[in-house]
Amino acid sequence: MQTLDVYQSLWAMEQRHPRKPEPSAEENFARIAEAGYTGVCLDPSVPEIPETRALLPLLQKYGLNCMLNVFPHSVAELRPLLELADEMNAELVNIIGGVMPVAVEEAVPVAEAWLRTSDDFSFPVLFETHRDSLLNDLFYTLQLIERVPDMRLCADLSHFVVNREMRLPLRDEDRAYMSTILNRSDCFQGRAQIGRA
């Protein structure tokens, strides 16, 4: 039987209100647990490893699973981020790669190196479609996944929809492109907005 696990991104809990203090990490974890989410999604780059590691006791206290969206800015930076994910018992890791060669051919060895690094870990490692990252562009992504057949994706389609200014009804070509992305995806990122006064 299939199940759907839903994780709340910790960054999305930020209020960003100029006259209100931000809730503490503990308050956010408590709210996430109370709302019934499977777990929390954390978003570290290498310099943020210590502060991310410090959240492990809150995951344990509130019985929440962990997934990481990691931001490596070199091929070598992926390993310490995956080691952090292993320490935190992450269920899943999404790479939002800060290595962005202009030519697809130059991205192939980057993706392949990250896949080899991920082979040393037991959790799934996916590549997220995301603005300002390796998979910034729909056409670039389609070409790269064709050249690297083992790449599995986390689809954040909003970046492609906005980037391409897609309109409804979708053109047949756009539908086919999106179907290709979805067929290579094991995870999805999405946003829900609740209007607040």
Report the location of each language-model feature:
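Aromatic/hydrophobic pocket-lining residues that form the small-molecule binding cavity
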Residues: 25, 52, 77-78, 104-107, ...
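Active-site beta-loop-alpha junctions enriched in small/polar residues
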Residues: 9-16, 43-47, 69-73, 98-100, ...
